A protein has these predicted regions:
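Short beta-strand/loop motif that positions the catalytic acidic residue
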Residues: 203, 209-211
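Flexible "cap/lid" loop of the alpha/beta hydrolase fold
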Residues: 101, 105, 112-141
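Gly/Ala-rich beta-loop-alpha elbow adjacent to hydrolase catalytic centers
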Residues: 92, 96, 100
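Conserved HGGG/HGGXW glycine-rich cap/lid loop of the alpha/beta-hydrolase fold
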Residues: 6-61
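Conserved alpha/beta-hydrolase catalytic His-Asp/Glu region
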Residues: 126, 145-199
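Acidic catalytic loop of the alpha/beta-hydrolase fold
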Residues: 214-222
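Catalytic histidine-centered segment of alpha/beta-hydrolase-like enzymes
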Residues: 243-255, 259
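Active-site loop/oxyanion-hole signature of alpha/beta-hydrolase fold enzymes
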Residues: 50-91
Length: 268
């Protein structure tokens, strides 16, 4: 089981393929396994794909301390040093997109291009633990909350109705290594406390901003559809692409289109 000792924690990682490094960063409290459903097979054809489990998730260490997105970025940067991976394409989904922004800002030599998928720069009114999430988690139970929330946010009602097998295939992977609730909450606090809104102008790398047109379910008054507009306006060399009839999890409901858009971007 490949792990790297970085910043006093053991980080689980995998490498697939050869070529320019391509680092995939998962959403909140999610390990790297989800990328193996579609993305690893596609991009390892011509890239050195690197996935990992954040601290607090999967097979990585789970220290009971406060987490921040800066800490996650430090871990990724140290892992890249360990692997000798520089000038990489960074693909960050949701919270992973927030971590990707910090990599570009604080470790610019490590980042060739950015793909910021279904993400944002900050949560203006909701720091700490959102009350709505806490209530739902208590009422539904942790595992049911995570499962039902993933479906609600991830896909349209039409997709859920007509593709139950695909939904279950994704959930089987997502729920298999579900982290203990303590670390879900630590990740959630880290995500909600993230704020790069005043630093977007300093991101110099080309950035593709990808979002589903229906990605509007969030824990504050600004949703991912809106926050993607903020990113596009704030990052100088950026391009916004909106996927029609998609919500948060188009990497799994419409991978061919997402892959085509990303390949066009990294080819330019």
């Amino acid at each position: 089981m490949p792990t790297a000792k970085v910043n006093d924690v053991e980080i689980y990682y995998e490498e697939h393929g050869k070529g320019r490094p391509m680092v995939f960063l998962s959403e909140t409290a999610c390990d790297g396994e989800v990328w193996k459903i579609n993305q690893v097979g596609e991009f390892s054809k011509d890239h050195r794909v690197i996935i990992h489990d954040y601290r607090g998730t999967g097979r990585s260490s789970k220290p009971s301390i406060d987490y921040t997105t800066s800490m996650f970025a430090e871990d990724v940067a140290a892992l890249m040093d360990h692997l000798g991976a520089e000038d990489a394409i960074i693909v960050g989904h949701s919270m992973g997109g927030r971590v990707a922004q910090l990599l570009a800002l604080d470790y610019p030599e490590k980042v060739h291009k950015l793909v910021l998928a279904s993400t944002g720069a900050h949560y203006p009114q909701t720091k700490g633990l959102p009350l709505k999430i806490c209530k739902e988690m208590i009422e539904w139970g942790y595992e049911k909350y995570e499962r039902d929330h993933t479906i609600l946010v991830g896909w349209t009602e039409e997709y859920v109705k007509h593709h139950p097998e695909e939904i279950e295939r994704y959930l089987k992977v997502r729920m298999h290594n579900l982290c203990p609730v303590e670390f879900y909450l630590r990740h959630l606090i880290a995500r909600q406390s993230h704020d790069t809104s005043q630093r977007l102008k300093d991101i110099k790398q080309p950035a593709l901003i990808l979002v589903g047109d229906g990605d509007r379910n969030m824990t504050s008054e600004i949703n991912h559809r809106m926050s993607s507009e903020v990113l596009a306006k704030g990052i100088p060399n950026s391009k916004l692409v909106v996927l029609p009839n998609e919500r948060h999890s188009y990497f799994f409901s419409n991978p061919d289109e997402a892959h085509r858009i990303i390949r066009d971007f990294i080819r330019d």
